[in-house]
Amino acid sequence: MALAPSKVSTFSGFSPKPSVGGAQKNPTCSVSLSFLNEKLGSRNLRVCASTVPLTGVIFEPFEEVKKSELAVPTAPQVSLARQNYADECESAINEQINVEYNASYVYHSLFAYFDRDNVALKGFAKFFKESSEEEREHAEKLMKYQNTRGGRVVLHPIKNAPSEFEHVEKGDALYAMELALSLEKLVNEKLLNVHSVADRNNDPQMADFIESEFLSEQVESIKKISEYVAQLRRVGKGHGVWHFDQRLLD
């Protein structure tokens, strides 16, 4: 639709027309535009913009930041970033850091065992070393999150890990992999507990962190190691263990 430039009116203030009973139909409309088309005649275009927020609440930052819970701490040794982070959540993260470090310690002991010259299952050694590094990375990720939320990292003692994994009936390979499976399930159980602490304290950010960074990966690890256990049960303690070890080495 072409407009005749010389016949286009200027913007004018909106004068609302009263509806039945004298009430305004739309008190928030602000401007109207009239124009003339040579073929269709005069047309009116009304542009409305709401001046009232949909929620009925206007954001007033300079007033709202005066709330006591938003005040920036001035005392030394007090986190400036901490907000809505319960003490129970802080403790749960520290406990999970310890869980991850303990798991890493066990896997590192398994790596050392299979790397011995009289065991010499290099594929198993590689698998458990990588598992140890992964658990340590999980601990470091939790430590970084603790600092992000304004908590304080507290490292708890790590339990001694066994150094011998020979098993008369199962053999060392199957026994070690079953131990790894049980350990992964235990770590998963601990992670679910941390998630429940976040829910109990109404901390959706911590719950999202545990879900997105740990839970999916944990069930995938459980599935993979479960398959390894099933396959090792099939091959027994003999020559099949060597072939399985070569596959882990690839």
Curated annotation (Swiss-Prot):
Keyword annotations of the record: Chloroplast, Iron, Iron storage, Metal-binding, Oxidoreductase, Plastid, Transit peptide
Enzyme Commission (EC) number: 1.16.3.1
Any single GO CC term annotated in Swiss-Prot or TrEMBL for this entry: chloroplast
A Gene Ontology BP annotation from the UniProt entry: intracellular iron ion homeostasis
Catalysed reactions listed for this entry: 4 Fe(2+) + O2 + 4 H(+) = 4 Fe(3+) + 2 H2O
Domain of life: Eukaryota
Predominant place of localization: plastid
InterPro entries on file: Ferritin, Ferritin-like, Ferritin-like_diiron, Ferritin-like_SF, Ferritin_CS, Ferritin_DPS_dom
Residues at which Fe cation 2 binds: E135, E184, Q218
Enzyme class: oxidoreductase
Residues of the signal peptide: none
Cited SUPFAM superfamilies: Ferritin-like (SSF47240)
Binding, Fe cation 1: E100, E135, H138
Ferritin-like diiron domain segment(s): 83-236
Transit peptide residue numbers: 1-49
Places the protein is found: Plastid, Chloroplast; Plastid
Free-text tissue specificity from the UniProt record: Leaf > hypocotyl.
Location of region: Extension peptide (EP): 50-82
One example GO MF annotation: ferrous iron binding
Other known facts: Multiple cleavage sites may occur in the extension peptide yielding several smaller (26.5 kDa) ferritins subunits.
Assembly: Oligomer of 24 subunits. There are two types of subunits: L (light) chain and H (heavy) chain. The major chain can be light or heavy, depending on the species and tissue type. The functional molecule forms a roughly spherical shell with a diameter of 12 nm and contains a central cavity into which the insoluble mineral iron core is deposited.
Similarity-based family: Belongs to the ferritin family.
Main function: Stores iron in a soluble, non-toxic, readily available form. Important for iron homeostasis. Has ferroxidase activity. Iron is taken up in the ferrous form and deposited as ferric hydroxides after oxidation.
PANTHER family assigned to the protein according to its UniProt record, in alphabetical order: FERRITIN, FERRITIN-1, CHLOROPLASTIC
Protein name: Ferritin-1, chloroplastic
Native source species: Glycine max
